[in-house]
Regions:
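Structural core segment of the AMP-binding/adenylate-forming
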Residues: 1-58
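ATP-dependent adenylate-forming carboxylate-activation enzymes
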Residues: 1-12, 24-29, 126, 145-166, ...
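A short helix-loop-beta submotif of the ANL/AMP-binding
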Residues: 1-5, 10-19, 119-120, 138-148, ...
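Conserved ATP/PPi-binding loop(s) of AMP-dependent carboxylate-activating enzymes
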Residues: 252-255, 266-298
């Protein structure tokens, strides 16, 4: 379970969500906080039963087999994803319908021009987090490629076993996960038959040691990526298309206009320090599709 009762209560109260879908592992936390969330009217439980809950399978069975899709605009709200709260309480970032399509150029590049025939995706990133959702699950499904799911607690042995068993070709692995794998199984190809062809890594700096290990031990050059909940997949590497270096965050992914600027908003020269800035308009002059609509209730 990614969130405990307090974290769930905060998000449900702030978002005024009226419906929750949960499973057996998450239901006790929802039950414990339900009285504190007045907007929450319905709880749908998957493979579990509780007081005042609806059964997922029954609810699905009672729905009509045909429906009319709702017409939406690219700037209409699609997702409310809460940040990790690095600088205070988590903030609800309201994402537009265009966010997934905007992510795809970076996803394709960071996964060495995904998809190829036979590609299979796996990542330990939780699908409730923007990284697991927008950098793994939804892009893989968009391209009609299988993605492996596992509820087991992460370990190096689990990672290598899953990748071997399901012939995983592409993955999103945090630098911390790669460090754990490197320490536990220094020479993985001596023990596992792997088919990895691309790894994207984000969330923190990869570092020289991990970068060099993935090349030598896994036969893959890790593609480091930079993004955040509010504007994802904007800068990174693609070893299949341009040289990737340890310690380099890469280049702007296709379509995005990115610069390093000073306090006056002007681009700095090579070798100078500044802030990474994403232009609100893409390289075609249109609003960049990955940029969030705003913070919920703020």
């Amino acid at each position: 379970v990614l969130f405990g009762p307090d974290a769930l209560e905060y998000r449900l109260q702030d978002s005024t969500a009226s419906l929750v879908i949960t499973d057996q592992a998450g239901l006790p936390n929802i039950t414990a906080i339900r009285a504190h969330c007045p907007a929450l009217k319905f709880v749908i439980a998957v493979d579990s039963q509780g007081i005042d809950t609806l059964d997922w399978h029954d609810s699905l069975h009672n729905e009509p087999t045909t429906f009319s899709a709702v017409s939406t605009q690219k700037s209409d709200p699609a997702l409310l994803i809460y940040t990790s709260g690095t600088t205070g309480s988590p903030k609800g970032a309201l994402m537009p319908q265009s966010a997934l399509l905007g992510n795809l150029t970076g996803f394709v590049a960071s996964q060495n021009w995904f998809p190829h025939d036979g590609d299979v995706f796996w990542s330990p990133a939780d699908w409730a987090w923007t990284g697991g959702l927008m950098d793994a699950l939804l892009p893989a499904l968009y391209f009609g490629k299988p993605i492996v799911a596992s509820r087991a607690r992460f370990s190096a042995e689990l990672a290598f076993s899953l990748m071997e068993k399901y012939s995983v070709t592409n993955s999103f692995l945090f630098p911390t996960a790669l460090k754990i794998m490197m320490k536990a199984v220094p020479s993985p190809r001596q023990h596992y038959q792997l088919k990895l062809r691309a790894i994207m890594s984000a969330g923190e700096a990869v570092g020289d040691t991990v970068f060099n290990w993935t090349q030598s031990a896994l036969g893959v050059t890790v593609n480091e990526m930079f993004g955040q909940t509010e504007a994802n997949y904007i800068v990174g590497n693609s070893a299949a298309k341009w040289p990737a270096r340890a310690g380099s965050m890469g280049r702007p992914y296709p379509g995005h206009r990115v610069a390093v600027i000073n306090d006056d908003g002007q681009p700095v020269n090579a070798g100078e320090t500044g802030e990474v800035a994403l232009n609100r308009n893409d390289s075609h002059g249109h609003p960049d599709p990955v940029i969030f609509l705003g913070y919920w209730n703020n």
